[in-house]
Amino acid sequence: MSIDTYTETLKINKLIEKATSHFQLSSTQLYKKILKNHEGELTELGAINVKTGKYTGRSPKDKFIVTEPSYKDNINWGDINQPMDEETFLKLYNKVLDYLNQKEELYIFSGYAGSDKESRLKLKVINELAWHNLFARNMFIRPESIDEAQNIKPNFTIVSAPHFKANPKLDGTHSETFVIISFKHKVILIGGTEYAGEMKKGIFSVMNYLLPIQDIMSMHCSANVGEKGDVALFFGLSGTGKTTLSADPKRKLIGDDEHGWNKNGVFNIEGGCYAKAIHLSKQKEPQIYNAIKYGTILENTVTNDDGTVDFDDNTYTENTRAAYPIDYIENIVTPSKAAHPNTIIFLTADAFGVIPPISKLTKDQAMYHFLSGFTSKLAGTERGVTEPQPSFSTCFGAPFLPLSPTKYADLLGNLIDIHDVDVYLVNTGWTGGKYGVGRRISLHYTREMVDQAISGKLKNTKYIKDDTFGLNIPVQIDSVPTTILNPINAWNNKDNYKAQAYDLIQRFNNNFKKFGKEVEHIANKGAFNQ
């Protein structure tokens, strides 16, 4: 099959220039379309509540990268970065473009990924659904004017057709759903799923390719900055506390999920926040709760007849979400960038209940835990996950990393050295027993520990090296019970603790073998009990 970039561009332009295609609509204009099309409902808080159908999380098994000659040797192919040949992609791409051309209305957004203009990606988003376009408007960086938007020549285009269902036998997919990235054609093609998070994570995957090949670190983390300009990064997978812990009233938010780190410092890749909304309350998370207002999208929350939202109701999913512009948070940095980090926090939700609530890592331990990326898959963030499961996600973001893990590890290691960054491992998971026996570590105590780490109070405090993991645990932290600092003390049965801990250590060792001899020096110095 032959189709050139010129032909594709003509088809894209035809979609954009259709009389019924709506370009750069405001939030109010999109609200009107959403309500008219019955895509969502208005809540008492002013936010729009939508349902994403049967897919309430990402579909990682349906994600592909096109095997184009100029790029294929750079990609870390495997279960995460699944290959699709170019001919198969182009056939499906044209089917989707023809499908969208028949739609009565389309919604177009132009904007950016990357708040540092030196490391910015120009975007165009073509949506079948009005609420998806509002999502794009909320999550990506918005141009300051219509004129600016019209003059954006995109480096990448998202084509989103959630109601187009693929035929696996004909289209080369695994199911009706597909998320396909083509670096040659500069397209992210999405179909068969209404879960809007595929758009944001698709662009993140693209940035995780484009930035590191320029020796710019890309990171699955949140970031904030204190009054003195001290910057903290929070690494962790969905549900481990990145959004919650970085939304600190005492510090200004840089971003809640995706960042780059270049010669100028840290910058947000996005223009919005995508916060978990399950059990959200004004008391526990006031900044996030106050962002649930006009312009915000709520995904899969339950509303009562009077329009009130029941954030505790998980009828549709545990993975309820709120998508809002970053300026809905009161304490933010504008633009969303800051200096080089002083502190890095690795967040993990340990379902075994054996990792300390906080420990200070050496450089080698930091690299070991960055490559390991231990956490637990939390309910709802992926299809098929209904309770926490221990897992390893390289660099705390394996589903979004197209390149070899060592590329990201080398970049981070160099930056830690250059800028003398303190690194801590923080367990936001369980204590006193594994999941189902123990309890979740109190958010209040986690905040206290993190606050004192990023303020520098823990930099020179007294530490003990625990016998089980070889981690440096603070002897005392103000306002935190000493009984929880060393996890063995929180278990009633010490033998059970040791058995569970050694089981986890063995899992770490087995997982690290996949990296081979290339990182043997990190394992020798950074692994548990070294």
Swiss-Prot record:
<dbReference type="InterPro" id="IPR013035">
    <property type="entry name" value="PEP_carboxykinase_C"/>
</dbReference>
<feature type="binding site">
    <location>
        <position position="58"/>
    </location>
    <ligand>
        <name>substrate</name>
    </ligand>
</feature>
<feature type="binding site">
    <location>
        <position position="285"/>
    </location>
    <ligand>
        <name>ATP</name>
    </ligand>
</feature>
<keyword id="KW-0067">ATP-binding</keyword>
<keyword id="KW-0210">Decarboxylase</keyword>
<dbReference type="InterPro" id="IPR001272">
    <property type="entry name" value="PEP_carboxykinase_ATP"/>
</dbReference>
<keyword id="KW-0547">Nucleotide-binding</keyword>
<dbReference type="InterPro" id="IPR015994">
    <property type="entry name" value="PEPCK_ATP_CS"/>
</dbReference>
<keyword id="KW-0479">Metal-binding</keyword>
<feature type="binding site">
    <location>
        <begin position="440"/>
        <end position="441"/>
    </location>
    <ligand>
        <name>ATP</name>
    </ligand>
</feature>
<comment type="pathway">
    <text>Carbohydrate biosynthesis; gluconeogenesis.</text>
</comment>
<feature type="binding site">
    <location>
        <position position="220"/>
    </location>
    <ligand>
        <name>ATP</name>
    </ligand>
</feature>
<feature type="binding site">
    <location>
        <begin position="236"/>
        <end position="244"/>
    </location>
    <ligand>
        <name>ATP</name>
    </ligand>
</feature>
<dbReference type="InterPro" id="IPR008210">
    <property type="entry name" value="PEP_carboxykinase_N"/>
</dbReference>
<dbReference type="GO" id="GO:0046872">
    <property type="term" value="F:metal ion binding"/>
</dbReference>
<dbReference type="GO" id="GO:0004612">
    <property type="term" value="F:phosphoenolpyruvate carboxykinase (ATP) activity"/>
</dbReference>
<keyword id="KW-0456">Lyase</keyword>
<feature type="binding site">
    <location>
        <position position="257"/>
    </location>
    <ligand>
        <name>Mn(2+)</name>
    </ligand>
</feature>
<feature type="binding site">
    <location>
        <position position="321"/>
    </location>
    <ligand>
        <name>substrate</name>
    </ligand>
</feature>
<dbReference type="GO" id="GO:0005524">
    <property type="term" value="F:ATP binding"/>
</dbReference>
<feature type="binding site">
    <location>
        <position position="446"/>
    </location>
    <ligand>
        <name>ATP</name>
    </ligand>
</feature>
<feature type="binding site">
    <location>
        <position position="321"/>
    </location>
    <ligand>
        <name>ATP</name>
    </ligand>
</feature>
<feature type="binding site">
    <location>
        <position position="201"/>
    </location>
    <ligand>
        <name>ATP</name>
    </ligand>
</feature>
<dbReference type="GO" id="GO:0006094">
    <property type="term" value="P:gluconeogenesis"/>
</dbReference>
<comment type="similarity">
    <text>Belongs to the phosphoenolpyruvate carboxykinase (ATP) family.</text>
</comment>
<protein>
    <recommendedName>
        <fullName>Phosphoenolpyruvate carboxykinase (ATP)</fullName>
        <ecNumber>4.1.1.49</ecNumber>
    </recommendedName>
</protein>
<feature type="binding site">
    <location>
        <position position="201"/>
    </location>
    <ligand>
        <name>Mn(2+)</name>
    </ligand>
</feature>
<dbReference type="GO" id="GO:0005829">
    <property type="term" value="C:cytosol"/>
</dbReference>
<keyword id="KW-0963">Cytoplasm</keyword>
<keyword id="KW-0464">Manganese</keyword>
<keyword id="KW-0312">Gluconeogenesis</keyword>
<comment type="function">
    <text>Involved in the gluconeogenesis. Catalyzes the conversion of oxaloacetate (OAA) to phosphoenolpyruvate (PEP) through direct phosphoryl transfer between the nucleoside triphosphate and OAA.</text>
</comment>
<feature type="binding site">
    <location>
        <position position="220"/>
    </location>
    <ligand>
        <name>Mn(2+)</name>
    </ligand>
</feature>
<feature type="binding site">
    <location>
        <position position="195"/>
    </location>
    <ligand>
        <name>substrate</name>
    </ligand>
</feature>
<feature type="binding site">
    <location>
        <position position="201"/>
    </location>
    <ligand>
        <name>substrate</name>
    </ligand>
</feature>
<dbReference type="Pfam" id="PF01293">
    <property type="entry name" value="PEPCK_ATP"/>
</dbReference>
